[in-house]
A protein has these predicted regions:
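Conserved two-lobed SF2 helicase motor
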Residues: 2-31, 215-230
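Conserved Walker B
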Residues: 13, 53-55, 228, 244-245
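Conserved helicase ATPase core of P-loop NTP-dependent helicases/translocases
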Residues: 188-228, 251
Length: 307
């Protein structure tokens, strides 16, 4: 049959559904000419497959390759790096090091700062671990704040002051900012609070249930690492304020990487660190080590803010 297109765009989810359906019941597909699962590429005359965000879903990507039969493939990723040694080993099997294009030194243009704040001696009710003495959980941290009216007001005040100082007061023409929170509840609370305090600009929330235009049209967007941490480009984005404490190298590089080089706007990535929470200090040290060769500079902004 004649094909009236040169490029096909298809999601991983759609392909995964096709693979599962074909493997479970291949007979209906054979009437369309798919005698084998790889015939998909022959029927649509696909000779070159490009896959973005190749660092995600390694198991699916490996299975994807087994079912792919084309002349050329190209996988794209800025963060084919893993903290877990087992995952790192598997990634080198799927994407052999000798087959990777080494572009050399990173284009280092992002200025990174750890924004430090502290807890008041009287602060009570904060939780930040999964269970008793478990791993750090930032969702738990945010939810414990939201359960306490005094803590909520104090935390919102800290975020407002940081946004004021690091974005509003020094904002370039048409410059935009992202504020990362971890939970839907905190995103809703912070976005409403900042819109009330900064009525001269548009503040939007952007999470999974929101319109994509929310991300692109506002001067200030409150979002989550899952919603806008990878695969999105915000025009004129100059400032990221990350309130979420994350250890993952891949996640930290991806979040900072939302800042694209712009000769008219400096790229600044700020992450919050509470000096009284051991996990925050540990993650701060890890981020400095992991980002040291990827960004322009890493510094510390010691504030008087207290929660």
């Amino acid at each position: 049959n004649d094909l009236h297109f040169k490029v096909m765009m298809i999601s991983n989810t759609t392909l995964d559904n096709f693979h599962k359906d074909y493997l479970a019941n291949p007979k209906p597909w054979k009437k369309y000419g798919l005698k084998h699962i790889t015939d998909f590429y022959t029927i649509f005359k696909i000779g070159f497959r490009i896959r973005d965000e190749a660092h995600e879903h390694l198991h699916f990507n490996f299975k994807f390759d087994l079912f792919t039969h084309v002349g050329k493939t190209l996988d794209l990723s800025a963060t084919l790096i893993y903290d877990d040694q087992g995952t790192e080993r598997i990634s080198k099997i799927i994407y052999p090091v000798n087959d990777r294009f080494d572009q050399g030194k990173w284009d280092t243009y992002i200025e990174v700062m750890s924004v430090e704040y502290s807890l008041k001696p009287t602060t009570k009710g904060l939780k930040w671990t999964q269970g008793f003495n478990g791993p750090y959980n930032h969702n738990q941290f945010e939810l414990s704040i939201l359960k306490n009216r005094v803590l909520t007001e104090a935390y919102l005040g800290i975020i407002r002051a940081i946004v004021q100082e690091l974005f509003i007061d020094v904002r370039a023409d048409n410059e935009k900012s992202l504020v990362y929170c971890s939970t839907k509840e905190m995103c809703s609370k912070v976005s409403a609070y900042l819109q009330d305090r900064f009525s001269h600009i548009t503040v939007n929330r952007y999470i999974g249930e929101d319109e994509y235009d929310n991300l692109l049209t506002a001067e200030l967007v409150v979002t989550t690492p899952k919603s806008a941490g990878t695969g999105v480009d915000v025009p004129n984005l100059g400032v990221i304020i990350n309130t979420v404490n994350i250890s993952s190298t891949q996640a930290n590089v991806q979040l900072a990487g939302r800042l694209r080089y712009n000769e008219k706007i400096a790229s600044r990535y700020y992450y919050l660190t509470c000096v009284n929470i051991p996990h925050h200090l540990k993650y701060d040290a890890e981020k400095r080590h992991k980002l040291r060769n990827i960004v322009k500079s890493i510094g510390t902004l010691d504030t008087a803010h207290r929660l």
